[in-house]
Regions:
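Conserved P-loop NTPase
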Residues: 3-16, 183-229
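A general structural motif
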Residues: 29-34, 108-116, 135
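Conserved nucleotide-binding/hydrolysis micro-motifs of P-loop NTPases
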Residues: 4-6, 27, 45, 87-91, ...
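Conserved catalytic network of the ASCE P-loop NTPase/AAA+ motor domain
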Residues: 41-43, 53-54, 71-76, 98-101, ...
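Conserved P-loop NTPase nucleotide-binding/switch module
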Residues: 125-185, 189
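P-loop NTP-binding catalytic core
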Residues: 1-45
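Glycine-rich phosphate-binding P-loop
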Residues: 45-67
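P-loop NTPase switch/communication element
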Residues: 70-119
Length: 229
């Protein structure tokens, strides 16, 4: 943190640095096993959106989903996956080589803007699945429509506490209303980081709900289902 220097309306650098936040990417292998039965159909994957506040494990979950869907597992043949890693948080690449295990059938574009990277992968890498972290901009939304209309499956993450939060953001609301995503995974850290609260389908049906969620958030979930229906 410090003083941000602008040039022609764009951020050029930061001076008078007062604090440094060092983030270390790490893996939790196997953390996605609970959600896999809800996001696959035969040997295909549903368009999936992971919803989570900061520091609740959405990138960690996404990374492990990429690894397992790429490698494959009993009953599921591995898929080719293209990853756009805009902030180097998924693969933690060094000189283009992922330091995290993201699967044997995974291609990664490191430090590439998501909107450009998704289109590049479609045109040149023939992925079955495209995975991106933290969508939200108008350019991201436009690229997402290109992905889903070319036969690729999409797995993405977004900041938020619930589906209601997503619907309050105009670009993302359109994705929900048009049922672009077929699965919604909502995370929290009430008990532990990466806790899976609920999993919805595109019609608003609850496929999974944590036991404590049934008691503490029943009204919230009913409202979310009503909004999607």
């Amino acid at each position: 943190a410090g003083k941000v220097i602008l040039e022609s309306g764009m951020i050029k650098s930061v001076r008078h640095i007062s604090f440094i936040n060092i983030r270390l990417s790490h893996q939790v292998k196997g953390c996605c096993k609970k959600v896999l039965p809800y996001i696959i159909n035969g040997n295909e994957t549903f368009h999936t959106l992971i919803i989570s506040p900061p520091r609740c494990g959405k990138t960690t979950l996404l990374r492990d989903m990429i690894r397992m869907l790429s490698d494959g597992f009993p009953g599921f043949k591995g898929n080719t996956i293209g990853v756009v890693d805009e902030r180097s948080e998924i693969g933690a690449c060094y000189k283009g080589v992922p330091q995290n295990d993201i699967g044997i059938r995974t291609d990664i574009l490191d430090c590439c803007p998501k909107s450009y990277g998704m289109l590049m992968l479609i045109r040149s890498m023939s992925p079955q699945i495209i995975a991106v972290d933290e969508i939200g901009s108008r350019d991201d939304i436009d690229a997402i429509y290109s992905v889903i209309n070319c036969g690729c499956k999409l797995i993405a993450t977004v900041h938020g506490n619930s589906i209601d939060d997503i619907r309050n953001r105009p670009g993302l609301r359109k994705l929900v209303d048009e049922r672009v995503f077929e699965r919604y995974i909502v995370l929290s850290n009430r008990k532990r980081t990466g806790e899976i609260r609920t999993i919805f389908d595109d019609r608003g049906s609850v496929l999974f709900m944590a036991e404590d969620e049934r008691l503490t958030s029943a009204y919230e979930n009913e409202a979310a289902v009503a909004e999607l229906s």
